[in-house]
Design a protein with these regions (language model features):
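Intrinsically disordered, low-complexity regulatory regions enriched in serine/threonine/proline
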Residues: 1-40, 56-57, 62-76, 81-153
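Surface-exposed charge patches
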Residues: 43
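Short secondary-structure junctions
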Residues: 46-58
């Protein structure tokens, strides 16, 4: 991770926010909500504010895209077995430029001794909470990324 990406994440207090998200949505795996309706989740994502969102059946994840002048940002949400794996990517010329899964970004920032668990959910209400917080974090990362890296054509 380069210094600019560290600056992006530190400026939005990424590690603290992700830790708070994981703590708030930490339940016994026996309570997890493994069966959900993809079309319901798509509608929920649109209500939250995710734009250009679609479900990729083959890879089994949801993706939202946001474009700027020279970058495209991709917000991925893989929700299986009641667990939410969240990802944020910046693409340039259709190639990976920066980003990663939230746990990997946290690890690169803090290098914790042990890997932490992913947020999990028991119902649609929990899932909405996770996706709402994740959306704001992704939007903040995108805005801060554009400030730090610039968006000149």
């Amino acid at each position: 991770m380069d210094k600019q990406m560290v600056e992006v994440l530190n400026n939005i207090h990424f590690a603290e926010r992700y830790q708070a998200l994981r703590t708030q949505y930490s339940f016994d795996s026996k309570e997890s909500f493994a069966t959900y309706d993809n079309s319901y989740v798509l509608a929920m994502l649109r209500e939250i504010g995710y734009a250009s969102v679609k479900y990729w059946r083959k890879e089994n994840f949801f993706q939202a895209r946001k474009k700027s002048n020279i970058y495209e940002f991709r917000y991925h949400m893989c929700i299986k077995y009641g667990i939410a794996e969240l990802m944020w990517y910046a693409m340039k010329n259709n190639k990976y430029y920066a980003g990663g899964s939230f746990p990997n970004l946290e690890y690169d920032l803090l290098n914790p001794e042990n890997r932490n668990h992913l947020p999990n959910f028991r119902n649609y209400e929990d899932l909405r909470g996770i996706l709402t917080i994740a959306f704001q974090m992704c939007e903040d990362m995108t805005a801060q990324f554009l400030k730090v890296y610039g968006d000149v054509t």
